[in-house]
Amino acid sequence: MESSKQKRCRSSVVETIEAPLPLVWSILRSFDKPQAYQRFVKSCTMRSGGGGGKGGEGKGSVRDVTLVSGFPADFSTERLEELDDESHVMVVSIIGGNHRLVNYKSKTKVVASPEDMAKKTVVVESYVVDVPEGTSEEDTIFFVDNIIRYNLTSLAKLTKKMMK
Amino acid sequence: MAGICCGVVGETEPAAPVDSTSRASLRRRLDLLPSIKIVADSAVAPPLENCRKRQKRETVVLSTLPGNLDLDSNVRSENKKARSAVTNSNSVTEAESFFSDVPKIGTTSVCGRRRDMEDAVSIHPSFLQRNSENHHFYGVFDGHGCSHVAEKCRERLHDIVKKEVEVMASDEWTETMVKSFQKMDKEVSQRECNLVVNGATRSMKNSCRCELQSPQCDAVGSTAVVSVVTPEKIIVSNCGDSRAVLCRNGVAIPLSVDHKPDRPDELIRIQQAGGRVIYWDGARVLGVLAMSRAIGDNYLKPYVIPDPEVTVTDRTDEDECLILASDGLWDVVPNETACGVARMCLRGAGAGDDSDAAHNACSDAALLLTKLALARQSSDNVSVVVVDLRKRRNNQASS
């Protein structure tokens, strides 16, 4: 009821990475190691492993993320809603933290690039989130898009380095 | 410490007059409190409570500079050299000899409530001789994202400045300091988080986790507030939101202006560069960084630049001390209050007759200011440097 009053916004960020899909996906799908490519993550600990699957891979897994200093938040609590290794889709919700991102849910989809199926990968991250009080929808989208873009840029650099 | 507090409590000193022309005064968030109240706050040292939910409570770790012992012996050694020079030289006039001593200093750096210590302090008395004058270097660096940029500034900036000043024509301090900061920024950018290159030895004592997770390298930076003190001038170069304040005859004179993203001229510069300032827990460049200038932070260039703003101030007989500190202090202690606290400590040591007493007074001032910041719930690392700028008499007793 309360959340229905809150204005929501949505956006998508697309990044083409010069690396094969299996490599890109192997990093993205590691729910327990977001610091491998997420720029502002300092460390991550798993709170619960969820049902089924290996640690950090099961649906319902929850991670506690510690963010770097200087960033406008200290921590974030996130849950893995969906992880599909066949369609290369990952859905993550943010369920806590002091970043002002409430009711945040993102879907990341990875596909081989039509340009070069074997060597290029397209990552699409789409999300919905409440617009925080006192902030405009435009600013909210700019902020979140920015964070995602930085993360995907780091991912591109990382995979490039790994292929050397 | 208790002795100093008791002594100060007995004094009935009026609050320092507010400088209405000071921009810092206009921005101050806290009322100027009576000096006795301030001391009481610090002396009692109320238990630190975790008022802000976003901060985890950490044990306060008080640490002086690891090189503090060397610093003491260096200062003592320099004093002897200075006195010897004065004694043996007939050409030195009385006025000049007043300024030839190395200034007494005090410094503290504490982690406070933050999870990690990312501040660094750099003290280099007599780091440069120029035109027969002793130059002294003092710097405070408040890192974010990780500590290695601030550590690198501590290790290298004084040497970079020295090399630039040695080739400086006349007194072009602004150009020289801008060049120095830009070189420092380039240096931290080129070294991939201190990874071993060409067999070069790693300079960091403890490897920071950036070595293992290189994506975070770009998001590391530091403020830098630096002062070069000469017999006649105080040169302050500032990049970021640490600050330098001069205490002159009881009045707090800011020698730097904080680089906040919503400062009108900084906001315009960022927008003209194609960037954007978003209010997300305060004004932030691209919603991420709460300062508009920093050493490092490559991912935010060209919006966040390493160029310092430089001020050159002539020294006067009324100068009491210079305070350099990170925003862990200035966010909770107004300039005037800091000035008043330092002044009380220095007065307690008399007019600088005894060099050891003056040195202790500076240390007490730095420590007292740090405790005051923590008592006022500062949520950041706190680093403070207090430099005694008072003249010293020729008949100074040997310690």
Swiss-Prot record, chain A:
Pfam families: Polyketide_cyc2
Phenotype for F71L: Becomes an ABA-dependent inhibitor of PP2Cs, including PP2CA, ABI1, HAB1, and HAB2
Localisation per UniProt entry: Cytoplasm; Nucleus; Cell membrane
Keyword Cell membrane tagged: yes
Classification via InterPro entries: Plant_def-hormone_signal, Polyketide_cyclase/dehydratase, START-like_dom_sf
Record keyword Nucleus present: yes
GO terms classed as biological process: abscisic acid-activated signaling pathway
Assigned keywords, A-Z: Abscisic acid signaling pathway, Cell membrane, Cytoplasm, Membrane, Nucleus, Protein phosphatase inhibitor, Receptor
Region (START-like): 3-160
Similarity comment text for this entry: Belongs to the PYR/PYL/RCAR abscisic acid intracellular receptor family.
Subunit structure comment from the entry: Forms heterodimer with PYL10, thus antagonizing PP2Cs-binding and ABA-independent inhibition of PP2Cs. Homodimer. Binds ABA on one subunit only. Binds to CARs protein in an ABA-independent manner, both at the plasma membrane and in the nucleus. Interacts with PP2Cs such as PP2CA, ABI1, HAB1 and HAB2.
Name used for this protein in its record: Abscisic acid receptor PYL13
Gene from which the chain derives: PYL13
Swiss-Prot record, chain B:
CC cofactor note: Binds 2 magnesium or manganese ions per subunit.
One Pfam family from the record: PP2C
InterPro entries xrefs: PP2C (IPR015655), PP2C_BS (IPR000222), PPM-type-like_dom_sf (IPR036457), PPM-type_phosphatase-like_dom (IPR001932)
Mutagenesis / variant outcome for changing G139D: Loss of phosphatase activity. Loss of kinase activity but intact binding and repression of SRK2E
Sites where the protein binds Mn(2+) 1: D142, G143, D327, D331
Cellular component, GO, one term: nucleus
Record field: catalytic activity: O-phospho-L-seryl-[protein] + H2O = L-seryl-[protein] + phosphate; O-phospho-L-threonyl-[protein] + H2O = L-threonyl-[protein] + phosphate
Keyword DNA repair among UniProt keywords: no
EC number: 3.1.3.16
Cofactor annotation: Mg(2+); Mn(2+)
UniProt key word Nucleotide-binding: no
The organism's place on the tree of life at top rank: Eukaryota
One Gene Ontology molecular-function label: metal ion binding
Description of what induces expression: Repressed by MYB44. Induced by cold stress, drought, high salt, and ABA.
Post-translational modification (record): Ubiquitinated by RGLG1 and RGLG5 in response to abscisic acid (ABA). Ubiquitination of PP2CA leads to its degradation by the proteasome.
Mutation effect (G287E): In ahg3-1; hypersensitivity to ABA during seed germination, and loss of phosphatase activity
Site residues by UniProt (Lock): W280
Listed SUPFAM superfamilies: PP2C-like (SSF81606)
UniProt activity-regulation remark: Repressed by PYR/PYL/RCAR ABA receptors in an ABA-dependent manner.
Free-text note regarding domains: The 'lock' site stabilizes the complex made of PP2C, ABA and PYR/PYL/RCAR receptor by keeping receptor 'gate' and 'latch' loops in closed positions.
Role this protein plays: Major negative regulator of abscisic acid (ABA) responses during seed germination and cold acclimation. Confers insensitivity to ABA. Modulates negatively the AKT2/3 activity, which mediates K(+) transport and membrane polarization during stress situations, probably by dephosphorylation. Prevents stomata closure by inactivating the S-type anion efflux channel SLAC1 and its activator SRK2E.
Protein name in the entry: Protein phosphatase 2C 37
